[in-house]
Amino acid sequence: MGIFDELNLPAGVLYGDDVLKLFQYAREKQFAIPACNVTSSSTAVAALEAARDQKAPIILQTSQGGAAFFAGKGIKDSAEKREASVAGAIAAAHYIRSIAPIYGIPVVLHTDHCAKKLLPWLDGMLEEDEKFFKANGVPLFSSHMIDLSEEPVEENISTCVKYLKRMAPMKQWLEMEIGITGGEEDGVDNSEVDNASLYTQPEDIWQIEEAFRPISPYFSIAAGFGNVHGVYAPGNVKLHPELLGKHQAYVSEKLGGKDKKPVFFVFHGGSGSSKEEYREAISNGVVKVNVDTDLQWSYLVGIRDYILNNIDYLRSQVGNPEGPNKPNKKKYDPRVWIREGEKTMKARVEEALKDFNAAGTV
């Protein structure tokens, strides 16, 4: 028995109550779903293929920078309208929606880290969501993430409330962040923040729950428990996933104590974390774990090794160790070397699915 049997979910991109059911099931069964940042059709299919082969759900997400890359680096992305990142995110969404069903797994289609300066990007996507919802009864994206963790708590919550009210009629999921994740990722740089800012307080979690619950049940919280974006050796990041358990207990008591884990938590900045740290966080209600930095590296590894191993076939179009007139087209065809990156990225996603207990849940 698994997700399809117990929850009656479709293959392909999920929306609304199906997303809620998936996260409830993950929290109950103590697994988390990797959220893979994708920047192209190639990175998207690598993650989908990994999830298919591991019989697991997957979350595919685009950051603002990743979405702009999807549209093309030659397109202007103005601060006022974010034309390229809006168009790129929409293009990625339609592409993923089109191919996800043939992989036979549940997929959540998400956008990542929308800071205050990037809200025009979110506005543009929500306009498209509303048009799509009017025509199809579901939004284009399953969910969006707003990251106002650098702003005052009151501003963070009130802004998210405004957007949640807009998203609620579409039953669209909102992920928000409270407590700063250190380090730097995709233009959001918190590498110089005070360490105390890396730990969210239980009162903040309750303030969010109290504000959001009357509007919609479709939300999750990326809380800070020492998380840091970027690349760090194991042991160099001091995580305290036990704090998430204390947050759950605090909110549970406020709600009457019936539900012992009422909060959906998200784990950001996990590079260098141990399997034990991941699993402790998952046991405390983490249902989504962001995976970006490691996937960038893993994708490169396959391409790098292919080039190094075939360098004598890649110096010219004609001529190689087999003869001066031998063609090299089969070696430099992009479908060959890009596929090598997909293979190594796929392997890293499969590792994450196993580490987060998600493998075999479909």
Swiss-Prot record:
Q: How is the cofactor bound?
A: Binds 2 Zn(2+) ions per subunit. One is catalytic and the other provides a structural contribution.
**Residues engaged in binding D-glyceraldehyde 3-phosphate:** 63
Annotated residues that bind Zn(2+) 2 are located at: 147, 177
Task: Please identify the protein, giving its name as recorded.
Answer: Fructose-bisphosphate aldolase
Please tell me the species this chain comes from. Answer: Neurospora crassa (strain ATCC 24698 / 74-OR23-1A / CBS 708.71 / DSM 1257 / FGSC 987)
Q: Name one GO cellular component term.
A: cytosol
UniProt-annotated binding residues for dihydroxyacetone phosphate: 230, 269-271, 290-293
Q: Which InterPro entries match?
A: Aldolase_TIM, FBA_II, Fruct_bisP_bact
Q: Domain of life, per the record?
A: Eukaryota
An example of a GO molecular function for this protein is: zinc ion binding
Biological role: Catalyzes the aldol condensation of dihydroxyacetone phosphate (DHAP or glycerone-phosphate) with glyceraldehyde 3-phosphate (G3P) to form fructose 1,6-bisphosphate (FBP) in gluconeogenesis and the reverse reaction in glycolysis.
Q: In which pathway does it act?
A: Carbohydrate degradation; glycolysis; D-glyceraldehyde 3-phosphate and glycerone phosphate from D-glucose: step 4/4
So where's the catalytic machinery, residue-wise?
A: 112 (proton donor)
Instruction: State the family it belongs to.
Output: Belongs to the class II fructose-bisphosphate aldolase family.
Catalytic activity reads:
beta-D-fructose 1,6-bisphosphate = D-glyceraldehyde 3-phosphate + dihydroxyacetone phosphate
Q: Which UniProt keywords apply?
A: Glycolysis, Lyase, Metal-binding, Zinc
Residues that bind Zn(2+) 1, according to the entry? 113, 229, 268
In its keyword annotation, does this UniProt entry include Calcium?
no
What biological-process terms (Gene Ontology) are attached? Answer: canonical glycolysis; gluconeogenesis; glycolytic process
What PANTHER family does the annotation carry? FRUCTOSE-BISPHOSPHATE ALDOLASE, FRUCTOSE-BISPHOSPHATE ALDOLASE CLASS 2
Q: Which cofactor does it need?
A: Zn(2+)
Asked if the Swiss-Prot or TrEMBL record annotates the protein with the keyword Lyase, the reply is: yes
Gene3D superfamilies of this UniProt entry? Aldolase class I
